[in-house]
């Protein structure tokens, strides 16, 4: 079952790619429901789907609505796994959803603070020292982007935009905090994702998955 934010290109893109990949692997989408960003009452949607048979809810969107949807679903007795994307990665998901509701919840992300890779451990420690809080995936991506550009400048044949662009496109096996990445012919990053599992709203498990 997919419940998506119909006002978000991000959510619609995740939903379409999930549906394509899931059905190609033999899965069945039993239904699709929609809301728009800013909605706060999801009881009508959840009451409508409560009696349906489904193994999981795929919930592409951001934590603002996801936290409320998961909380309302659990209150209605819907205990099936909830799956999402990197839009779940915020401490406010716990504030909105509540610890009791945020079990059997999994989301794909760019990195996990549970990763014991020395690069990740150092990044988290340095970030905490400077800013007094734990970084999320968007902080890690920002850091990696800066390092990625610096690396490309160092490899470029000249210090001009065209040369740097070429160097960026030629990136192979760049060691980033969010994982080793290469750039494909369409300028997309090829890298592993991390699947994170929550226990009482806190990251409890993480597993890297490569294509």
Residue ranges of model-derived segments:
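Periplasmic-binding protein-like
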Residues: 1-5, 53-63, 69, 80-85, ...
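An alpha-beta-alpha
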Residues: 1-33, 56, 149
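Active-site-proximal beta-strand/loop segments in catalytic clefts of secreted hydrolases
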Residues: 2-7, 33-37, 59-63, 85-88, ...
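Extracytoplasmic/secreted cell-surface and envelope-processing proteins
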Residues: 9-13, 66-68, 92-93
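Structural motif
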Residues: 11, 34-48, 116-120
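Sec-exported extracytoplasmic/periplasmic mature domains
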Residues: 19-27, 47-54, 71-78, 98, ...
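Extracellular/periplasmic periplasmic-binding protein-like sensory domains
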Residues: 70-143, 197-205, 209-210
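Segments of small-molecule ligand-sensing domains
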Residues: 129-139, 150-202
């Amino acid at each position: 079952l997919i419940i998506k934010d119909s006002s978000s290109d991000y959510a619609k893109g995740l939903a379409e790619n999930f549906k394509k990949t899931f059905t190609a692997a033999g899965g069945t989408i039993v239904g699709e429901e929609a809301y728009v960003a800013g909605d706060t009452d999801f009881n009508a949607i959840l009451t409508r789907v409560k009696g349906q048979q489904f193994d999981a809810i795929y919930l592409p969107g951001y934590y603002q609505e996801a936290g409320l949807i998961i909380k309302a679903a659990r209150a209605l007795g819907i205990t099936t796994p909830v799956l999402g994307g990197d839009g779940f990665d915020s401490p406010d998901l716990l504030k909105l959803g509540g610890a009791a509701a945020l079990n059997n919840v999994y989301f794909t992300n760019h990195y996990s603070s549970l990763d014991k890779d020395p690069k990740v451990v150092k990044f988290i420690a340095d970030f905490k020292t400077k800013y007094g809080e734990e970084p999320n995936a968007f902080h890690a991506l920002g850091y990696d982007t800066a390092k990625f550009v610096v690396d490309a400048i160092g490899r470029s044949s000249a210090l001009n935009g065209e040369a740097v662009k070429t160097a960026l496109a030629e990136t192979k096996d760049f060691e980033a905090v969010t994982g080793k990445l290469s750039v494909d012919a369409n300028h997309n990053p090829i890298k592993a994702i991390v699947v994170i599992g929550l226990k009482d709203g806190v990251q409890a498990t993480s597993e890297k998955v490569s294509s």
